[in-house]
């Protein structure tokens, strides 16, 4: 079961036109579906790589197949990679 949240929002005329364009382009039933589509599309660009499942899998493979480098502390990390 998908829970839906109802919201009353103020948007500009231009953004309203964009929502209508998305609604027509994807043959959506209403503006709510258009807004959800816009958010789904934008989420790919918004989410950081660290949050994506592909990134987590990539890190797991690296950790399994490569020998880790012991750093120790933040100070050691800075010395090693920043030359501080």
Swiss-Prot record:
Keywords in alphabetical order: Toxin-antitoxin system
Provenance organism: Methanocaldococcus jannaschii (strain ATCC 43067 / DSM 2661 / JAL-1 / JCM 10045 / NBRC 100440)
Pfam families: DUF2683
Function: Antitoxin component of a type II toxin-antitoxin (TA) system. Its cognate toxin is RelE4 (Potential).
InterPro entries the record matches: Uncharacterised_MJ1172
Protein name: Putative antitoxin RelB4
Gene from which this protein is expressed: relB4
């Amino acid at each position: 079961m998908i829970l839906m949240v109802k919201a009353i929002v103020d948007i500009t005329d231009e953004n309203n036109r964009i929502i209508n364009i998305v609604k027509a382009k994807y043959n959506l039933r209403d503006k709510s579906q258009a807004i959800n589509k816009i958010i789904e599309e934008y989420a790919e660009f918004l989410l950081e790589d660290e949050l994506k499942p592909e990134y987590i899998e990539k890190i797991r493979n690296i950790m399994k197949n490569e020998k880790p480098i012991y750093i120790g502390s933040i100070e050691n990390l800075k010395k090693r990679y920043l030359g501080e």
